Every structure is written in structure tokens, then in C-alpha cells.
Amino acid sequence: MHDIRAIRETPAAFDAALALRGLSAASADILAIDEARRAAITQAETAQADRNAASKEVGKAKASGDEAEFERLRALVSTKKDEIARLDEEAKAKDAELTAILEALPNLPSPDVPAGADEDDNVEQHRRGTPRAFDFKPLEHFDIPGIAASMDFETAAKLSGARFVTLKGAVARVHRALAQFMLDTHTEENGLTEINAPVLVRDETMYGTGQLPKFAEDSYQTTNGWWLIPTSEVTLTSLDSGNIVDEATLPHRYAAHSLCFRSEAGSAGRDTAGMLRQHQFEKVEMVSVTHPDQSNAEQQRMLACAEGILDKLEIPYRTVLLCAGDMGFGATRTYDIEAWLPGQDTYREISSVSTCGAFQARRMNARFKPSDGGKPEFVHTLNGSGLAVGRCLIAVLENGQNADGSVTLPAALHPWLGGKTRITAEGNLA
């Protein structure tokens, strides 16, 4: 949600930032509604003052025996009451109209975010690791002989339809180990607090992080009204919803491993083979709630935490700064980490690390009390994948594949696999 005071003060800058998002100017319409709302409130306050003054005079007129003045004042009190009710309704209607516009507009890009329309305009920051030189043509994950039998799309389609997978045996074990490895790293080495939260949430929870109302079609809703979370960013960020916390307690750093559910409404025909884009998947998510002065540094810290997972797994990757047109709805700055997938001969997104400024905090009324005793202020919220488990599994399998159909697993993962080091061409851990 946007700060109406900031729009009043710098409408041209607001419109310029929207233009970077590919949107038309909106400040004139917003300020016209805001002015009408404020005028109705002012008029209602004036009418209330007039009514109060007239009410005080009614008794005096009655006591003096001035019947005509008494009736005039009584009629005035009644008229003002009706006027106040009308103006209150007008103010409420304008407030609802204003909220409807503001809640549909995305966050504004940070000044250091590059201009651009889509992923072609993103700016690479750095690359880490060197893609392996194979002496055979590397396969995509679902075609690797040691993997194919344990990654069952046919059975999943029978159970649930397209964009689902059933993992079996060694592959299921590696998938589980990856999630545990990520979560343990973030909690034991990176200082995040592990959270196990619901995957079913209320409208208000989805609204607070910006999923509703704009992206309702991208999510799943149960028949009794709960929403299945598209990411545990929703629940982790909402832990501080409606709270006023002491400044000294910040930052709050959370991590969770959860199921995630997405309809992929806008992805028809994209990534239909394999498990790169699924309706149900698992992710280890990081969320930080910070003092505004610390949010930029915190984003760099979170980025390092996510990159550190790939460093440990020895998976080559690159990090890009997203342009304004490619950022998510709630972000003011986003870095994508893209893992090298030799089967596709390209880098693919495996994590997004975003700072949202006060955008989400304003929607969910999450604030902190300054240590100097000042008025409560909105916190800043940040989120990042640490990492997407299924996509990380793909990267591990494709980068570790061998000519005989087996897969060599990263050394960092061995302790979570009981010392096993590879998946054989027959699909067994060894």
C-alpha cells in the first residue's frame, strides 16, 4: 500500500515511478478522490461543531420561553444530524474508492533499480562457479537414466493432473535432504529462527503481503474460504501483522520449509516438461522484518545466505538485479539468483530476494516503537527463497550427472544422506 502523504507531496515522482512499472499516471485521480474525502471529513466536522453549538442553545431557548427560537434550534440540530450522516457516508465511500486504487498499484522501484520492461533488461551482477565441461551431451533431469524411474509424472497426472510429480526412492530422499540441509544452514549458521506455520490462511493474511486482491486467480482457495499459500513469505511476514514491536528487537529473521501452491494461471505452455514449474512444490523461505535504516544491508545479507547454499552445493549460478518492469508486485528491489542447468544449457531462477520497504507493513499495519520514544513507524519487510527445493534438486541432478546415467551428489549433502555420495544408474543411493 502506498503512503497518500507521499503522493500529495511528490505526485510527479509517484507518476514517474509508475511509468517505470509500465503504468499510466495515477496521482491526479488519486489526489482528486483524496481531496473529496478530506473535504467531506472537514465539512462533517464543521457540521458537528454547529450541531453541538445549537444543542447548547436549545435548553436556553426553552427556559426563556422563546418558542420560535426553540423550534428553530431544534430543527437545526436535526438538520445537522442528517448532514453529518450524509457527509460521513460520503467520506467512507471516497475512502473505499481511494483504497481500491492504492491497493491495486504495485510498489515503486527503488531509485537504483534499472529501467526496463522484462527479463531482457535485467542487469547481471556477478557469476560464481564455472559450468562443468561435459564429455557427453548432458540431459535434462527427467531424462537421466538413474533418475527417470524415480520421478514419476504419469502417476502424478493420474492422481492430480498436469504439473505434478511423484518422487520415489533415492530422488525423494535427496529432495528431503536438500530441504533439511537448507533449513539447518539458515538456522544454525545464518541465525534465522525456524518457523512451522499453517499453509492455509485467511483473506487478511494474503492481503497483507499483496497476493490479494490482484492475484487471486494465481492462488488456490478452499471451499470454506481459506487460501493455500503460494509461498511461506505470506505466513512469515504476517507474524508481525498488527504488532508494534520494540526497535531493540529488530531485525526479526525467520525461515520456514513449506509446501507452496500456485495455479500458474499466466504460464500456460511454459516449462511443461519436468518439474521446473509445478502447482505444488516445496521451498525454504527467508523473511526479515527490519528497521527502515537497515533494510538495504539486510537484503545483501539475505542474498549472501541464499547464494551460500549454492556455493556449498557447488552449483554454478549468476545473480541479476531485476529491472523495474520485471519485479514482483510488492518489491521495491529484487535480485534473482539463477542456477546453471546444463540440460537446458542456460541459467534458470532458483531464488528471488526482495525488499518491499514499508509497502507490506502498511497493508498489515506492522510497526515498531522507536527507542527514543518517538511515534510508532512502519517496519520494512524482506523475503527471499533459500532455496526452491525442487529447482535445487534439478540443479543438483543435472550438474552431477555422469555418462553412465548415474549422478554424483555434492559433498555438502552427504551428511544428510547417511554418507551416501551418488545415485546409481539403476536409481539407488550408494
UniProtKB/Swiss-Prot annotation:
Pathway: Aminoacyl-tRNA biosynthesis; selenocysteinyl-tRNA(Sec) biosynthesis; L-seryl-tRNA(Sec) from L-serine and tRNA(Sec): step 1/1. GO terms for molecular function: ATP binding; serine-tRNA ligase activity. It is found in: Cytoplasm. CDD domains: SerRS_core. One of its GO terms (cellular component) is cytoplasm. ATP binds at residues 262-264, 349-352. L-serine binds at residues 231-233, 285, 385. It comes from the Bacteria. The keyword DNA-binding does not apply. It holds the Pfam family Seryl_tRNA_N. One of its GO terms (biological process) is seryl-tRNA aminoacylation. It catalyses: tRNA(Ser) + L-serine + ATP = L-seryl-tRNA(Ser) + AMP + diphosphate + H(+); tRNA(Sec) + L-serine + ATP = L-seryl-tRNA(Sec) + AMP + diphosphate + H(+). PROSITE patterns: AA_TRNA_LIGASE_II. It is an enzyme of class 6 (ligase). The keyword Aminoacyl-tRNA synthetase applies. Its EC number is 6.1.1.11. Keywords: Aminoacyl-tRNA synthetase, ATP-binding, Cytoplasm, Ligase, Nucleotide-binding, Protein biosynthesis. Its main location: cytoplasm. Consists of two distinct domains, a catalytic core and a N-terminal extension that is involved in tRNA binding. Homodimer. The tRNA molecule binds across the dimer. Belongs to the class-II aminoacyl-tRNA synthetase family. Type-1 seryl-tRNA synthetase subfamily. Catalyzes the attachment of serine to tRNA(Ser). Is also able to aminoacylate tRNA(Sec) with serine, to form the misacylated tRNA L-seryl-tRNA(Sec), which will be further converted into selenocysteinyl-tRNA(Sec). HAMAP family: Ser_tRNA_synth_type1. NCBIfam families: serS. This is Serine--tRNA ligase.
